[in-house]
Amino acid sequence: MKPDYKLVAKAKYIHTTADLASEIWHEVYKRYYPGKQLDTLVEELQSAEAIEADIDNDVNYFLVVLGGKNIGYFAWKMENTALHLMHLYLKPEYRGKAIGRDIVLSCERLARGEGKGRMWCTVHAKALPVQQFFKALRYRNLKPAEQENGTVPRNELVFEHTL
């Protein structure tokens, strides 16, 4: 069964996405950040208010729905020459089932259709399985990411794929 992607626009879905983000981020990032720092990261970057501000800045959030259950979410922003994949998170039991790959490939098709020449994202420097995921999709590690916002330092790398 293939998942559906539901555009997050209404307040109800923004709050659903924020709750899902908090759940997944606390599972994914607990090995990289102490508890209070992680809580601050989630609040600054994935609270309902932060998601709403992103949406107001032309970021498109989507819930990933499979069999009526929210199993993850992703977000992207179209830039001048590229599509920036800002978030791609799935619940642990849905990883390794080609769902993330299909999301990345559909974003690449969208970017190509909009005449963009590349797609990029950031990955935590210690998240080796995620780096391998993007390398398998022909993304290359360009450089350390510059931190644009937030008070908690994030050790991230830029991965890019030329379309």
Annotate each predicted stretch with a short phrase.
Residues 101:
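Residues forming the Rossmann-fold NAD(P)(H) cofactor-binding site
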Residues 130:
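Helix-turn-helix
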Residues 4-14, 18-93, 104-106, 110, ...:
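Acetyl-CoA-dependent GNAT
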Residues 120-124, 135-156:
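Conserved catalytic-core motifs of GNAT/GCN5-like acyltransferases
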Residues 90, 124-125:
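Short amphipathic helical patch at the helix-1/turn junction of helix-turn-helix
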